């Protein structure tokens, strides 16, 4: 098949542009980091203009590397950091405030207030989500309540809101399209995932005008065309999905029971549950995996806030490594007789605990503990947290989906030590694919299949190829002892207000 597809992968710390050819092979990649802003404890912001400039720069870099004119690009697929919230002026396109990032915890008091009022069951029943600062809805409410004149302007229809995909679509199309897809909408705390519509009751509770929100489309749909002046050609935007759902698609997890986990800044495990919307009883998230041709496929998701960010802490915080890639080799040199546990609750704990007030802690230190032991504890914490997610998934699903095989992607997959540790702690095979750019690949497939130049779902799934399988090697008694120590460490970290 001929033609090129451009995937825009807008992440938490950087933006990437990946160009694929008609055979679904990567031709060129552009990447650019952008600043993070921490105006107060627990607050994390991005300047939307930084995001926009980084996206444009990476696309131009990828086109230059590929030696392609923009007119050779058949379609664009967009994938993005989810939940990050931005509100902008409808007339000028200027944001009224920095974007509030998914990691930001400033709306914890509002979430606590809503919980105290007994409203969490209503939000969960309608959205599949929990009342946590993680999600976009309370961020939108905070912006309307704390930016001078914002609520009045929103009610007059002068403002627009969205997650990062929506903001990029608006900018790319020159303000002609205010839209999102079902996966991003499902992460806002405002979208009824059973009815596939914005929920009037929830909007009323958070006092968010319906007109502020974007139109919700299928993941493979027409999201407008780019302004010619941006890249030199008008390019259709034909695919959009939140980053974890895009990775689920890129990993070809199309059948119920298939499971992937992405290891980037955080860790996100997604289990395809098919047309069945499973209501979690173990504080996982019920969400939309994707919506194609008007048909919704659901998923259970477990979200961990700190995964690769723990390695960044080793590098930037306590400076025991110079580069993230050094962490695995350093951990391999650790003293295995020491059992150190790092509970990386730097911004609270995500699933299945959902404790916004928990903070990080290290247990088991001795005088002989050093950089190698810290590195091992940081990497093992990723495996332990993933184990907690999979236990919760099994409790929700029973034996419906059979034996676990975990497909993995993200930057941490490059560490063989970490992936072997993951297989050992999970007592399950861990599969790494040949194409590691699974998030970009998922967005590209949405656009390419919609454009008619990439294969259908079944054929695409057959193209998934295994690079390496990590089989569990740890003795069962050792695994049990390690997990018991982890459970004890977590219990000591949780606050009195934690739900479990």
Curated annotation (Swiss-Prot):
Known regulation of its activity is: Inhibited by fructose 1,6-bisphosphate (FBP).
- Tell me the Pfam families matching this sequence: FGGY_C (PF02782), FGGY_N (PF00370)
Q: In which pathway does it act?
A: Polyol metabolism; glycerol degradation via glycerol kinase pathway; sn-glycerol 3-phosphate from glycerol: step 1/1
Q: Name the UniProt key words of this record, in alphabetical order.
A: ATP-binding, Glycerol metabolism, Kinase, Nucleotide-binding, Transferase
Q: Which top-level group of life is the source organism from? A: Bacteria
InterPro entries recorded for this chain? Answer: ATPase_NBD (IPR043129), Carb_kinase_FGGY (IPR000577), Carb_kinase_FGGY_CS (IPR018483), FGGY_C (IPR018485), FGGY_N (IPR018484), Glycerol_kin (IPR005999)
- Broad EC category: transferase
Q: Name one GO molecular function term.
A: ATP binding
List positions binding sn-glycerol 3-phosphate: 12, 82-83, 134, 243
Q: Which CDD domains match?
A: FGGY_EcGK_like
Q: Which residues bind ATP?
A: 12-14, 265, 308, 312, 411
Gene Ontology biological process terms, A to Z? glycerol catabolic process; glycerol metabolic process; glycerol-3-phosphate metabolic process
Q: Provide the binding site for ADP.
A: 12, 16, 265, 308, 411
Question: Which parts of the sequence bind glycerol?
Answer: 82-83, 134, 243-244
Gene3D superfamilies the UniProt entry points to: 3.30.420.40
Show the catalytic activity.
Answer: glycerol + ATP = sn-glycerol 3-phosphate + ADP + H(+)
GO CC field: cytosol
General function of this protein: Key enzyme in the regulation of glycerol uptake and metabolism. Catalyzes the phosphorylation of glycerol to yield sn-glycerol 3-phosphate.
State what protein this is by name.
Glycerol kinase
Q: Which organism is it from?
A: Chelativorans sp. (strain BNC1)
């Amino acid at each position: 098949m001929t033609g090129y597809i451009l995937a825009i992968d807008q992440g938490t710390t950087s933006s990437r542009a990946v160009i694929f050819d008609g055979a679904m092979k990567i031709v060129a990649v552009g990447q650019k980091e952008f600043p993070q802003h921490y105006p107060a404890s627990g607050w994390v912001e991005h300047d939307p203009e930084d995001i926009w400039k980084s996206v444009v720069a990476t696309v131009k870099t990828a086109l230059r590397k590929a030696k392609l004119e923009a007119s050779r690009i058949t379609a664009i697929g967009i994938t993005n950091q989810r939940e990050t919230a931005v509100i902008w002026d409808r007339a000028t396109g200027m944001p009224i405030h920095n974007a509030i990032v998914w990691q930001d915890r400033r709306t914890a008091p509002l979430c606590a207030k809503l919980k105290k009022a007994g409203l969490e069951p209503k939000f969960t029943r309608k959205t599949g989500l929990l009342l946590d600062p993680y999600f976009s809805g309370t961020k939108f409410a905070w912006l309307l309540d704390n930016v001078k004149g914002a609520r009045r302007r929103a009610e007059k229809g002068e403002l627009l809101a969205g997650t990062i995909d929506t903001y990029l679509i608006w900018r790319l199309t020159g303000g002609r399209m205010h839209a999102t897809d079902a996966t991003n909408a499902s992460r806002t705390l405002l979208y009824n995932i059973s009815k596939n519509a914005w929920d009037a009751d929830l909007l009323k509770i958070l006092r968010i005008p319906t007109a502020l929100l974007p139109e919700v489309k299928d993941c493979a749909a027409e999201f407008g065309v780019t302004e010619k002046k941006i890249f030199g050609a008008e390019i259709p935007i034909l695919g959009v999905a939140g980053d974890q759902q895009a990775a689920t698609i890129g990993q070809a997890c199309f059948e119920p029971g298939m499971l992937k986990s992405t290891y980037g800044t955080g860790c996100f495990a997604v289990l395809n549950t098919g047309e069945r919307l499973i209501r979690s009883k173990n504080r996982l998230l019920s969400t939309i995996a994707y919506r194609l041709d008007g048909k919704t496929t659901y998923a259970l998701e477990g979200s961990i806030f700190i995964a690769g960010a723990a390695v960044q802490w080793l590098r930037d915080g306590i400076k025991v490594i110079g580069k993230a890639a050094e962490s695995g080799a350093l951990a391999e040199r650790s003293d295995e007789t020491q059992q150190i546990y790092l509970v990386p609750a730097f911004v609270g704990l995500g699933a299945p605990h959902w404790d916004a007030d928990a903070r990080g802690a290290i247990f088991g230190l001795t005088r002989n503990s050093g950089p190698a032991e810290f590195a091992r504890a940081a990497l093992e914490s990723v495996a332990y947290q993933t184990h907690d997610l999979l236990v919760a998934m099994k409790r929700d699903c029973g034996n419906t989906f059979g034996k676990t095989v975990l497909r993995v992607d993200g930057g941490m997959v490059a560490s063989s030590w970490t992936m072997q540790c993951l297989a050992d702690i999970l007592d399950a095979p861990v599969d790494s694919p040949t194409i590691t750019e699974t998030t970009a690949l998922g967005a590209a497939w949405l656009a390419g299949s919609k454009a008619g130049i990439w294969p259908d779902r079944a054929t695409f799934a057959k193209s998934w190829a295994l690079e390496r399988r990590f089989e569990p090697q740890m003795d069962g008694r050792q695994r049990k002892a390690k997990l018991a120590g982890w459970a004890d460490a977590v219990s000591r970290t949780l606050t009195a207000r934690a739900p479990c």
